[in-house]
């Protein structure tokens, strides 16, 4: 087996690159690197020979780490593709046959590598297009024989080493923000210097545009023919080497990616052609990675926003439906309550016929009252009619108050359904109808008056809007009409006894009873000493009137008994001789409040029926 002697040339190229970068900073290509020291070269060569071939990734990354101060800033602002081109050119020279006999065989690869390295460094520091350097002439390969089999093995080993080195170089990217800023600043300075020089030479805008366009064309690489297919082994090694997450950062930090591609693809392709291996096309995946992540995040946010909007819309629809259903139930209950009350103030729904019948009935009553007055009993009959009218009005108000109380109690409950409310409200109507039928004795009117068809149609339409069945509305209307007919033909009800006048409403709180009058009160001028013979019964008064059980009466001048009771009025129990006054005042206050509440509820119900139900289309 032939010994492996390639790492020496590779390390030599590394040293040349390091010294060139240290001597020529970005933007100043006139400074050339100083000569290398033999001691440093030998030390680095020994370290490189002792390093195993497969375990190169940690050491190369450690060499790229800018933190140690003894090694300096390695690969400061260097494109990894340019570095790869230098290494490939250096690896290609030992494999080629010697073109110069004698001692020149050793110096030819070194000179070619140095020239290629200098050109690569200049391409990194200059924004102007660098002239292509022709690859050194390679002698035609000798015919393959069986004696050259070891060389082919060495060639395959070299290709494997090159693939591993390329994998390491692809993983390399300057993640330091400071390094990116320095590289971008150097390129901007170089570009500004170039454009300024062109402007100074020929200030015309056309010349400046041509210079910029020529620079752009020089930077963009020409399309080369497609390379031969990639070997399977090399393709597998390249597919395994995935780019690091910092690759898109490298693309963002560099202002013109085409410049780097144009400067590095040409020497790298020539090096591959000299080795006889294929040249893989370099594709920029940074933008695709970045664009894919941003697009996915944007789509995810849009989807979440759409889901949230749909959820809010469904919630609003559900709340609106619940509100509409609740209002419909309330309106249906109010309509049913109004129909069961008899339609005392029905104007448009009840129709005109009912109002005409009521007007005729009132006219008949007035005529009868006038006839009775003419007969001689005007005063008595007038008083009886007034009392009957008052009694009827009071009975009607009591019935309405009871129904309103039931209605508002059901509205506050809010949990019972419309069917339960309807059944609770229809039951009193049936009971009253049966009671009136029993009192009437089974008499029925033959002349059944039918309601106006328009009124019935309007009621049915209103019931449909209020979620009430049409059959229920028709039955309710028929029951109300039958009740009115029976009430019209029924004998007059007995007049109830007059109700006691309610207490005045201005009394809000019961007044305390007046104090009891003092007994055996002596004049003030005779109050030298208390008359013990006259107050024997008050020395120890009974317990309820004494604030303390162990009270001791002092033997000094005391005020009269009446004044003492005034002092202890807050501790005494309420007077026993006025128990009915407080109860009467309390009852009067409660009745006044109930009457006020009833009138207010009645007024609200009438306003709702007149302004909402009757005017609804």
UniProtKB/Swiss-Prot annotation:
Disruption phenotype: VGF-deficiency produces a lean, hypermetabolic mouse that is resistant to diet and genetically-induced obesity.
UniProt-listed InterPro entries: VGF (IPR026128)
Modified residues (Pyrrolidone carboxylic acid): 313
Compositionally biased spans, kind Acidic residues: 149-160, 378-397, 437-452
A molecular function GO annotation: growth factor activity
Residues in the signal sequence: 1-23
GO cellular component terms listed in the entry, alphabetical order: extracellular region; extracellular space; Golgi apparatus; transport vesicle
Keyword Glycosyltransferase carried by entry: no
Listed Pro residues bias regions: 491-501
Region span, Disordered: 29-75, 93-204, 239-262, 345-599
Biased composition (Basic and acidic residues): 48-64, 345-364, 418-436, 577-599
Modified residues (Phosphoserine): 423
A biological-process GO annotation: sexual reproduction
UniProt keyword terms in alphabetical order: Amidation, Antibiotic, Antimicrobial, Cleavage on pair of basic residues, Coiled coil, Cytoplasmic vesicle, Growth factor, Phosphoprotein, Pyrrolidone carboxylic acid, Secreted, Signal
Comp. bias intervals (Low complexity): 182-197
Outcome (variant: residue 576 to A): Complete loss of lipolytic function
Protein name as catalogued: Neurosecretory protein VGF
């Amino acid at each position: 087996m032939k010994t492996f002697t390639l790492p020496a040339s590779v390390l030599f190229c590394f040293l040349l690159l390091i010294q060139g970068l240290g001597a020529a900073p970005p933007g100043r290509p006139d400074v050339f690197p100083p000569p290398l020291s033999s001691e440093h070269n030998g030390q680095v060569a020994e370290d490189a020979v002792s390093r195993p071939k497969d375990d190169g990734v940690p050491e190369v990354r450690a060499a790229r780490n800018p933190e140690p101060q003894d090694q300096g800033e390695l690969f400061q602002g260097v494109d990894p593709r340019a570095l790869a081109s230098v290494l490939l050119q250096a690896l290609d020279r030992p494999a080629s046959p010697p073109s110069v006999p004698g001692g020149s065989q050793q110096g030819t690869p070194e000179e070619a590598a140095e020239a290629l390295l200098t050109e690569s460094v200049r391409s990194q520091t200059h924004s102007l297009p660098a002239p292509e350097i022709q690859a050194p002439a390679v002698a035609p390969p000798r015919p393959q024989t069986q004696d050259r089999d070891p060389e082919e093995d060495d060639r395959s080993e070299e290709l494997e080493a090159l693939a591993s080195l390329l994998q390491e170089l692809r993983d390399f990217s300057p993640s330091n923000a400071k390094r990116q800023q320095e590289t971008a600043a150097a390129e901007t300075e170089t570009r500004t210097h170039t454009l300024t020089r062109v402007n100074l030479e020929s200030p015309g805008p056309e010349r400046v545009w041509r210079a910029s366009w020529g620079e752009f064309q020089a930077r963009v690489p020409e399309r080369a023919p497609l390379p031969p297919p990639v070997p399977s082994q090399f393709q597998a090694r390249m597919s395994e080497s995935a780019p690091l997450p910092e690759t898109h950062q490298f693309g963002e930090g560099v202002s013109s990616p085409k410049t780097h591609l144009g400067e590095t693809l040409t020497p790298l392709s020539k090096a591959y052609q000299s080795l006889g291996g294929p040249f893989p096309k370099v594709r920029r995946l940074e933008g695709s990675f970045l664009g894919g992540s941003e697009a996915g995040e944007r789509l995810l946010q849009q989807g979440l926003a759409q889901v949230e909007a749909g959820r809010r819309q469904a919630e609003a629809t559900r709340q609106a439906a619940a509100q509409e259903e609740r209002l419909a139930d309330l309106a249906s209950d109010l309509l049913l309550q109004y129909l069961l009350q008899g339609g005392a103030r029905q104007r448009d729904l009840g129709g005109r016929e009912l109002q005409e019948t009521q007007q005729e009935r009132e006219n008949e009553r007035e005529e009868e009252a006038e006839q009775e007055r003419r007969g001689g009993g005007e005063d008595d009959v007038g008083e009886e009619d007034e009392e009957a009218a008052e009694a009827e009005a009071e009975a009607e108000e009591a019935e309405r108050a009871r129904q309103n109380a039931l209605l508002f109690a059901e509205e506050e409950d809010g949990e019972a359904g419309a069917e339960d409310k309807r059944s609770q409200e229809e039951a009193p109507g049936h009971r009253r109808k049966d009671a009136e039928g029993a009192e009437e004795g089974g008499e029925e009117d033959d002349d059944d008056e039918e309601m106006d068809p328009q009124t019935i149609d309007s009621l049915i339409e209103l019931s449909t809007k209020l979620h009430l069945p049409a059959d229920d509305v028709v039955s309710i209307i028929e029951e109300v009409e039958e009740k009115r007919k029976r009430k019209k033909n029924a004998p007059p009800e007995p007049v109830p006894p007059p109700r006691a006048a309610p207490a005045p409403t201005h009394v809000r709180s019961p007044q305390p009873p007046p104090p009891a009058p003092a007994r055996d009160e002596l004049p003030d001028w005779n109050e030298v000493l208390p008359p013990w013979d006259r107050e024997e019964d008050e020395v120890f008064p009974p317990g309820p009137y004494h604030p303390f059980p162990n009270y001791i009466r002092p033997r000094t001048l005391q005020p009269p008994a009446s004044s003492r009771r005034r002092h202890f009025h807050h501790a005494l129990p309420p007077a026993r001789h006025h128990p009915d006054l407080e109860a009467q005042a309390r009852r009067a206050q409660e009745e006044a409040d109930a009457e006020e509440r009833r009138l207010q509820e009645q007024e609200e119900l009438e306003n709702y029926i007149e302004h909402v139900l009757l005017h609804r289309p």
